[in-house]
Amino acid sequence: MAILAGIIAYAASTFLVTGPARPGWLDSWFYIALELGAATVVTARVVLRPIERTAWGSIAGALYAVSLSDAAGAAAAATDRPAADVLDMLAFAFDAAFFGLAFAGLVLLVRKRLPPSTASVWLDGVIASLGMLSIASALFYRAADAITVASLLFLVYAVAPLVLVAILVGTAAALGRRPSEIWVLCTSAFSLMAVGNLIQATGLPWAVQPGSPVDTLWPLAALLLVAAAWRSRSTPRPVGSGSSVVLAIPSVFTLGALAVALVNQFTSLSYFSIGTAVVTVMAGALRLLFAVRDADRLRVRQVELNVSLGLARDAA
């Protein structure tokens, strides 16, 4: 409750206390304290509950990495060069650690929720993941005519949360059923992180200045991960009933990737958007071949069943 109250207070301050009158500690140490608080609550869950301990421990480590990255960034802003450059590199290293730990945690969570499946089911997840990355990157990323270190860092910063969302979207497609409450909470959390990064990546003055409403998204996302961690109480099993909307996800993202390729004929998109669109369409074509194969196998089985029923009727 204390973390929730702190997040509400911080969110209100982004509207009520702006400009030169805004104290610097609100956007540095108070903000970092909110992130550390969320990470600590997830860590407490890891200590107290053995279920999925490694997975949630990785996610707790990811939240700590975000806090340390922001702390290094705040220290860099108050330090002169060359120490500031070292702190900036340290902040980037912690950002990379966040992605690695969050990725590992999600993979561990997803692996226990996906039963042994056919190649078609896994391909549905790949199509949904790559298609979402292609569409989102086409909407938000600038074209990269020349690949530089700065453009690569920009791409990593903007893409990392999207990759985490893509894993969860792909999981929903692979399950082929209505996702669980844990999935909804995790997807909402990483989606908020992705939206925050995408808005800040636009470079709009109101979005990049300290204390903007966008800054509230990351602590709120951390709070959703806290809720997901503590709601996970038993051995995970795929739950829910079949959902035609979820089953249609691969087709929707394949069409979206085709749209990205079409838009590229009229305007220059990033290499990342084009590449993921091409791979998505190729995976969609392969999925169509699998569907034709499965339909043919079903037809053969139906014929064999009819023959068997006819023989049984004649024998009777």
Regions found by a protein language model. Give the residues of each.
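Polytopic alpha-helical membrane-helix bundles and their juxtamembrane interface segments
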Residues: 1-316
